Each structure stands twice: as C-alpha cells, then as structure tokens.
Amino acid sequence: MENLLEMQKNVKAITRKYEEDLIKLNVEVWKDIDGYDNYAVSTFGKVKNTKTGRILKAGNDKYGYLQINLYYDGVMKTHKIHRLVCCTFIDNPDNKECVDHKNNDRTNNDISNLRFATANENQQNRKLSNNNTSKVKGVSFNKKAKKWHAHIQIDGININIGYYDNLEDAKTARVNRANEAFGEYTNACEKL
C-alpha cells in the first residue's frame, strides 16, 4: 500500500512537470475544472464541455471581464475565466486573493498574462484615468506652485515625493518610488 501511494505521488509530480514544460513551450494544456464533472479550462483561457468537446462562448461582464456559465446538477453558476485559469494552473502559496492581468487587457486570459496578487498589488497595475495629462499615475501639475507634483499612495498613506520644474523629473521620481514600493506590480506605463 505504501508503494502504491509513493507511485501515485511520483506520477503526479511527473505529470505536473510535463504540464509546466508544455506551458513554457506555449502549448495549450487542458485541465478539468474543480467541482465540475463536464468542463475543462485551457492555458489559453478557453473553456470546453468535456462531454461534447464544444468550446463554450464567453460573455463580458459589466467591467469587461470574460465570464462563462457552468452547470452542475442543473444549477448554473457564473465564473470569471481569468480566475478559472489562474486557480487551475498557477500555484498560490501566499494565498493572494486577486487575479491580476499583467497587461491590463481584461479579455486576455492566457496563463502568461495572469498572476495572483493582493488587492493592493492589483490596484497598482491598473490603467491610467482618461483625464491624466502627465501619462504617469501620481504626477500632476500644481498650478499654485507652477511645478509638477509627484506623489504616491502606499498602504493607504499618501506620500509626497516632491515638486519638480519639469515633467520628466517628476515622472522619474514617481516611477523610481513606485518600482521600490511595488516591484513587478508597477503599472507598465509607469516604467522608464
């Protein structure tokens, strides 16, 4: 019995390594969705009915995320596809609660574009608002001082980085501070 358990562990480890190698080669890998007998999700962000082999058509929620309806015992439940992909294929040892789209494209649910994040990390990697004229989060022109103001929020605390005569210096200061604070979760448009 002990040998059988050891063999099962070895098979699982080999299977996991094989799946990881396929993912690195950008090969589509399918896995069953936990809690559902008839559905599988792929590393490319597709969902299929395993009984019929049919790829299911996803819809958008009001925020632009792709979602899918799955049925179990006649009961329908709606799931966000990015969560299905991430929870199925990516380990989450730190138990981070959010799934982040690295490139901010809510419809790109490829495994290479997803990662687990805390709520704070997820907030750092968001698109700029449309009224941002500096094109960098946390940099604005202060009319009274007639200078560019760089600031940042870390753990809910607003921090003044400084006032600068030109936009480029303010951007550089903000980007450097964001990289220090948030690392890989710094928004792509904030990188120098």
Regions found by a protein language model. Name each.
Residues M1-L4, E190-L192:
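Short intrinsically disordered terminal tails
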Residues E2-R16:
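Charged, compositionally biased non-catalytic regions
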Residues K12-V99, N103-L192:
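Conserved recognition-core residues within compact binding domains
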